[in-house]
């Protein structure tokens, strides 16, 4: 077995081994989940909220989309939109990778009214990646859908349930032709 002698150390105060480097940093980075509000989520996307709908032929009800605050603008360019239901099993609240899409504003929402979590970081230019301290996490109520801005880095959906169904609106080829992934330098844990 080879042991490292003081003379074998790397210059410039670098760690002696990869193991020393890992041990010098915390094992996980905690990110406290915050409540989902328009103001807090604005840098990352929009919130689609339920609204009361009138009867189709009710003359007392007039629908004016320009006066509604429950609508969000969708970006579905350079591809064919697809709506799908994702059935996901328990994934826990830790993650070590984030992804983004540069051509589409992705929408996600729980179909069963279950709360869930999403970690996000603001869109970055070109190939630059977000810093760990710029990652935020949100608790998404089961009656909300989120729309991520084009290019928003994200990890999730995450949840504590055994399984969950999600509605996902994106381009058909989003996860093949419009998918950029990054590995984080540290495992992140969403804290409740």
What is the predicted role of each segment?
Residues 2-137, 175-178, 182-183, 188-192:
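Non-catalytic, conserved peripheral segments adjacent to functional cores
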Residues 139-157:
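Conserved metal-binding segment of the jelly-roll/cupin
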Residues 114-116, 136, 142-144, 162-165:
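A short pocket-lining beta-strand/turn micro-motif at the edge of beta-sheets
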Residues 141-145, 164, 172-174, 190-192:
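Glycine-rich loops and low-complexity Gly/Arg-rich segments
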């Amino acid at each position: 077995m080879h042991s490292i002698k003081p003379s074998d150390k790397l210059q410039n105060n670098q760690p002696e081994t990869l193991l020393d480097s890992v041990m010098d940093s915390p094992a996980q980075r905690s990110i406290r989940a915050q409540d989902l509000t328009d103001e807090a989520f604005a840098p990352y996307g929009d919130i689609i909220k339920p609204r009361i709908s009138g009867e189709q032929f009710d003359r007392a009800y007039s629908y004016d989309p320009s006066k509604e605050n429950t609508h969000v603008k969708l970006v579905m360019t350079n591809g064919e939109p697809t709506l799908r239901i994702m059935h996901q099993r328990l994934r826990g609240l830790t993650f070590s990778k984030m992804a983004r899409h540069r051509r589409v504003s992705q929408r996600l929402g729980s179909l069963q009214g279950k709360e869930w979590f999403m970690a996000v970081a603001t869109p970055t230019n070109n190939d630059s990646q977000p810093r760990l301290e710029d990652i935020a996490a949100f608790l998404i109520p089961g009656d909300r859908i989120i729309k991520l801005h084009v290019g928003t880095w994200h990890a999730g959906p995450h949840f504590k349930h055994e399984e969950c169904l999600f509605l996902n609106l994106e381009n058909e080829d989003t996860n093949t032709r419009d998918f950029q992934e990054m590995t984080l330098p540290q495992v992140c844990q969403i804290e409740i």
